[in-house]
Amino acid sequence: MSRVAKAPVVIPAGVEVKLNGQEITIKGGKGELTRVLNDAVVVSQEDNTIVFGPREGVTNAWAQAGTARALVNNMVIGVNEGFTKKLILKGVGYRAAMKGNAVGLTLGFSHPVEHALPEGIKAECPTQTEIVVTGCDKQLVGQVAADLRSYRQPEPYKGKGVRYADEIVRTKEAKKK
């Protein structure tokens, strides 16, 4: 039995929830998110909470209910507060700048890298070596941050590359003669 699924999701003030069968739409100040939930999950709205439970006769229904509850909770937090990922560029000549709806990166390649941002994601560069990715969809914010990091991951000897602000890069010792 899922302990996560047992806890209801509390809907804060200013957040609107619409249930249409297995499709749930959540609207708030930061945007609107829609998700189709698994058929093994029973969803109902009671006052200012969303309650999840398993459908009878389905083997992994509690597990699916816990997953659905976690996803919907992230949707509620996203449309209310939003999610943020901060990236730091470390290395000589490594720079970031906004170019319209794309992030322009200079990462030591023979060409500049431009990463187009998907709809619903905003990015800003407070300094030349920082990128802040924000949005209401937690999965999409994390994916865009991971895509930006993948252009030049931190290398293990000097730690040069694109890293998350809270990431600790373990460095190796150089080879000795």
Swiss-Prot record:
It comes from the Bacteria. GO terms for molecular function: rRNA binding; structural constituent of ribosome. One of its GO terms (biological process) is cytoplasmic translation. Keywords: Ribonucleoprotein, Ribosomal protein, RNA-binding, rRNA-binding. One of its GO terms (cellular component) is cytosolic large ribosomal subunit. The keyword Ribonucleoprotein applies. PROSITE patterns: RIBOSOMAL_L6_1. Belongs to the universal ribosomal protein uL6 family. This protein binds to the 23S rRNA, and is important in its secondary structure. It is located near the subunit interface in the base of the L7/L12 stalk, and near the tRNA binding site of the peptidyltransferase center. HAMAP family: Ribosomal_uL6_B (MF_01365_B). Part of the 50S ribosomal subunit. This is Large ribosomal subunit protein uL6. The lineage of its organism: Bacteria, Pseudomonadati, Pseudomonadota, Gammaproteobacteria, Vibrionales.
